[in-house]
Amino acid sequence: MSSASSAGRDTRSEILSQPEIWETTLKQLVSGESGDLPDLGSYDYVLFTGCGSTYFLSQWAARHCQQVRQVQAAALPASELLIFPSAWLRPGARGLLVAISRSAETTETLRAVEAFRELTKGDTLAITCNPQGPLAKRARWVLAAPHAQETSVAQTRTFTSMMLLAARLIDGGHAAQAHSALPAAARALLDQYGELAEAVGRDLQLDRFFFLGSGARYGLACEAMLKMKEMSLSQSEAYHFMEIRHGPMSMVDGRAVVLGLMGVEGRNYEARVIADMQTLQARTMGLSPDGAGAAGQISLGAEALPPIWRDPLYLPFLQLVAFHRAVAKGLNPDRPTHLEFVVKLDG
């Protein structure tokens, strides 16, 4: 990968450091440093909440929670829980709120926790990169990765590290397997496809990006969309794979990029969507565990891992595309327009 300008230096470093950061995070999880955690099966329902990136992480986690643990689970922005608590909270049922915040200081998330505790008296668990923050102090349990903390505004390695923390909560039995396979797969992915990410990101003839994901990967497609939008100020959208046919593909043409976060289940359906977008002249790429299923595939590796542990591999390549596009447009991805590291509300 060619050297970047000083603009975006922190973001680039944080993206490329993910193999080492994951190694540290997984070692922590395997060693038992995370301590005792709640039994998700003992709850009537589990809510995952966050804001922005961590809301998308919540979408991903809730889907895996419901599928892996067979527990009723949902994701919602913290503001929805704060403004419409009666639509979501069940005072007569035993619920767990999993609140996710990089900083542990986001006002909406803190207030959502207060509303949950006041109305349900239920348990709360915090997932964060700041174990000393107010969110961590208000939660019964804390899963934290302080070593992953960033200086950049846009979340990259914190997001994927908090994915690993959520995976430990939902499917802790495979943490050791992930520790053995995931960091090496991330290194190989960055080495093999880093130049491709740069080439796609720097191609300013492309002017719109579509990110597609099925199941839990829809939350990751939304996160990739947000990275492209906030870093590079580019038109970017996220959809469930087959939903792009129901209107959005009217925007697909030779200046569009369609990036599919492909899985094993539903692969034939997803491959057909990618093929359809190719006929509309879009540039297409599919990211999949084994590199099979469609033309222009990126092989993530670690295909033996359960999906919840393998899923972080979808993001480094997509983060790099957004980073290089920002730099090519003369922007500073470390400091996206109008954004701050933490959103704090007055009053």
Features from the language model and the residues they span:
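Alpha-helical transmembrane segments of integral membrane proteins
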Residues: 49, 213-216, 309, 313
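Phosphate-moiety recognition in structured ligand-binding domains
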Residues: 2, 6-11, 139, 257, ...
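Glycine-rich phosphate-binding loops that contact phosphosugars or nucleotide phosphates
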Residues: 41-184, 249, 259-303
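Short glycine- and Lys/Arg-enriched binding-loop motifs that mark or flank ligand-binding interfaces
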Residues: 46-48, 100, 209-211, 243, ...
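Active-site phosphate/pyrophosphate-binding segments
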Residues: 7-9, 13-14, 19-42, 141-257, ...
